[in-house]
């Protein structure tokens, strides 16, 4: 029973994060049609080439992302989980943009990626948990094998739901950062 309520609570929190990011996107988005003015404005937000920061980020960015993924994947076995792992991964992407700039970061994380990942994660979470609304079912016997206790794949739907929460949190942190800093992703 506790898992049922926690899962719906977490889904609600993830939806609130997504709605907040969407509202910030609408309110702070800078929709200039003049491409020259936009290019000049975007150039202003590119970081100055800082050799020390870039060298540090080349080492730290992969380590931060791996640690975030580790926290995310082990959240059902140890302290951590989706929110913690997502916050760490979001901080890693923010480090990348500060070291290498928006142009390089947009090669792997742009507004389209943000929308696909967040909507996909929230949709999966909603579909995975919504059956209890219709059946009144308990979430623990979900039909997914629980595996051996202590293994990564040992918790039914908890691991995929942690991954969904982590993706939403990481994307939202980066979206807030870029929207507050320059008015767009």
Please tell me what each predicted stretch does:
Residues 72-81:
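Membrane-interface helix caps and helix-loop-helix hairpins in membrane proteins
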Residues 41-60:
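Membrane-water interface at loop-to-transmembrane-helix junctions
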Residues 1-10, 148-163:
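Short aromatic-rich membrane-water interface segments that cap or initiate transmembrane helices
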Residues 16-25, 91-97, 161-175:
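Hydrophobic cores of alpha-helical transmembrane segments in multi-pass inner/ER membrane proteins
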Residues 80-91, 163:
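Structural signature of hydrophobic alpha-helical transmembrane segments
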Residues 98-113:
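Alpha-helical transmembrane segments
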Residues 1-26:
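Individual transmembrane alpha-helix segments
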Residues 111-143:
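A structural-propensity feature for long, helix-poor, extended segments
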């Amino acid at each position: 029973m506790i898992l049922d309520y926690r899962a719906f609570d977490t889904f609600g929190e993830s939806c609130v994060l997504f709605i907040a990011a969407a509202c910030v996107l609408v309110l702070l988005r800078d929709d200039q049609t003049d491409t020259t003015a936009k290019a000049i404005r975007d150039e202003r937000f590119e970081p100055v080439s800082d050799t020390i920061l870039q060298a540090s980020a080349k080492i730290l960015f992969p380590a931060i992302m791996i640690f975030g993924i580790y926290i995310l994947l082990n959240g059902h076995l140890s302290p951590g989980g989706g929110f913690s792992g997502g916050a760490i991964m979001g901080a890693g992407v923010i480090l990348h943009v500060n070291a290498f700039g928006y142009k390089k970061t947009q090669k792997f994380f742009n507004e389209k990626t943000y929308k696909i990942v967040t909507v996909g994660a929230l949709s999966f979470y909603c579909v995975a948990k919504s059956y209890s609304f219709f059946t009144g079912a308990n979430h623990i016997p979900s039909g997914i094998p629980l595996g051996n206790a202590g293994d990564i794949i040992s918790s039914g739907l908890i691991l995929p739901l942690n991954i969904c929460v982590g993706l939403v949190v990481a994307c939202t942190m980066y979206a807030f950062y870029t929207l507050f800093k320059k008015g767009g992703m």
